[in-house]
Amino acid sequence: DGYIPDGEMFARWAQLGAFSPLMRFHAKKDLFWHPARTCPDGWDGGSRLPWEWGPTVLESIRNSVRLRAALNPYIYTLMRAAHDTGVPLCRGMYLDWPERDEAYRFDQYLFGEAFLVAPAMRPSGDGQHGVTERSLWLPEGAWYDYFTGKRLEGGCEITRTSDLRSFPLYVRAGSLVPMTEPGDYVSAPLTTLTLRAYAPVGNCRTTFDLYEDEGENFDYEKGLNRRTLLTYDCSDGIQRLSVETPRGDYPEAVAERTCNVEIVGTPKPALVTVNGVVCNTWSWDNDLLTVRCGTVSA
């Protein structure tokens, strides 16, 4: 009925909300749930204010909100695709694997093409800081644990243990995910763009047609929007990320932005180039390559 019984439940709801079409914390006009309910300490609880639940829950919810905001370019593009094609943002596993029993048996789903979401379903028992575990199915192919960067081979059922800082969230190898710095509101201009790729096993070619519009009006119905084709190409040990010239425009579109590239699960490169010029503004740590490309034309 929307009542929040404990902090652990609140944090898990926020994690699920971050990977839902709509994320919000309110269910009615009040900050607290009324009428009052009996709680062990005499306090009604039910608050929708994350800081009312202590530092551990606050940190967990803050991380979920930041992750949701960082994924806004990915989510906004897929919401436009859902509008155009009817293919939902949240997809049952059976849409991609209709013949597999596991696709119906596990309560998990795809969030676009890249993410596999398996929400934490069982409480730890202490209501705040505990560890819980759940089983899930990883389809064939390689998948990355989003929170650790560890690569796993699919085609199996696994058990994942998590505290409130994480939950079972996996990214398909070969994926290209556009991200941004979390801002004050989701329709803020896309002035910072991070292209995060997840290294495949072998060769691959992945595209993502990034969509942008003003975000707060209906001018997109008049064709006022912009699309930018992003490509991640891996072949013979060479990885390439390319950004094509945008198609279309709208008055509020940014003319330039800060661009970064991240590649998860890649060995340390011998050479990095940007537009054919040797680049020295890169770092590599624990199989994560980060390239700071600076300000580029949008």
Task: Give names to the regions the model predicted.
Residues 113-114, 141, 237-239, 286-289:
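Beta-strand-connecting loop/turn residues
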Residues 6, 54, 213, 283-285:
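Alpha-helix initiation/capping motif
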Residues 145-164, 271-294:
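Solvent-exposed beta-strand/loop surfaces of large extracellular or lumenal domains
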Residues 118, 146, 242-244, 292:
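Beta-strand residues in well-ordered beta-sheet regions across diverse protein folds
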Residues 169-277, 286, 294-297:
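Accessory, solvent-exposed terminal regions and/or long lumenal/extracellular loops of proteins
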Residues 107, 135, 229-231, 281:
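Short, surface-exposed charged micro-motifs
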Residues 1-166, 171-172:
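Catalytic-domain carbohydrate-binding cleft regions of carbohydrate-active enzymes
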